[in-house]
Design a protein with these regions (language model features):
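Short, contiguous hydrophobic alpha-helices characteristic of membrane insertion segments
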Residues: 3-4, 58-59, 110
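Exposed loop/turn and edge beta-strand positions of beta-sandwich/beta-sheet ligand-binding modules
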Residues: 75
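Amphipathic alpha-helical dimerization/coiled-coil segments
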Residues: 84-111
Length: 111
């Protein structure tokens, strides 16, 4: 990232999901992980748009897997965080923790 380019909520969620899914992170799995962890359904097109932005910012890289018959001979695109992406995720996580620390109503679990 050239200048300080802050990530939006969806970009952060996608970056965190890529990290959670780990080696085999591709669009559908990333979308499912976001849904599982947040309870929000995210359109696959939105996930791919966020992945494209993250890749342009140098926070994730992509590579093509092997073509498979189940995908009509198409290769799946896999994503992984870069070192800059890992740093951005750590920074964002720390910022959120500091912002939320001591907030009334967040000290105990919400039922």
């Amino acid at each position: 990232m050239r200048k300080r380019d802050y990530l939006g909520q969806l970009e952060l969620m996608v970056l965190f999901a890529v990290m959670r899914v780990n080696r085999n992170a591709y669009g559908v799995l990333i979308s499912q992980e976001i849904s599982k962890q947040s309870g929000r359904d995210v359109a696959i097109a939105s996930v791919y748009a966020a992945l494209e932005r993250l890749e342009k910012k140098g926070l994730v890289t992509s590579c093509l897997g092997e073509p498979t018959a189940e995908r009509g001979g198409k290769a799946r695109t896999y994503f992984k965080p870069t070192m800059a992406g890992l740093k951005e995720a750590r920074d964002a996580h720390g910022t959120l923790l500091r912002l939320c620390s001591g907030l009334p109503g967040l000290a105990r679990p919400i039922a």
